[in-house]
Each structure stands twice: as C-alpha cells, then as structure tokens.
Amino acid sequence: MQITDIRIRKVEKEGKMKAVVSITIDDEFVVHDIKVIEGEKGLFIAMPSRKANDGEYRDIAHPINSATRENIQNMILEKYKTEIENV
C-alpha cells in the first residue's frame, strides 16, 4: 500500500485541531477527514469518525495494524510540517 497523495487543509480557528487531511492510496482510494490534532505529547492524527447512537465516536475507516497507522501518521505529519514552514 502506497500513499500517493496527501492534501492538507489548515484549520484557521484556535483550538487543538490544526488541519483536516485527505489521503489517496495507490491512486485508487481516498480517505477524507483525517484530523491533525495538537495533544499534550505533540501532534497526532485522528481517523475519520462518526458519532454513534450511544454517544461514542467510532472510526469510519482506520488501519488494521499499528505499523500501518504509524506509517500514515508519519507521512501526514511530515507533509503538514513542511506546509506550515512554507506559509
């Protein structure tokens, strides 16, 4: 699996959410609404989610293993930092 495109939309208002990201996988599949969040230990990503009837948020799409999640997160945050530096 290759991430072939990353699109970053910076969030202008103050808060913990810094950007909303779309990734394209293998030039064939797009995942929208991945969030870049500023946490206590630095930046991390949150996969797209929806609020269930019980009030809990559940991921709509997410990696199955931690290595894939880490790879996606590293690529997104690298691109985010590059775009922020170029502003």
Swiss-Prot record:
Keyword Cell division: yes
Highest taxon in the source lineage: Bacteria
SUPFAM superfamilies found in the cross-reference section: SpoVG-like
GO biological process: division septum assembly; sporulation resulting in formation of a cellular spore
Coiled coil residues, start to end: none
Keyword Cell cycle assigned: yes
Keywords: Cell cycle, Cell division, Septation
One family name in Pfam for this protein: SpoVG
Family: Belongs to the SpoVG family.
Entry function: Could be involved in septation.
Name of this chain's protein: Putative septation protein SpoVG
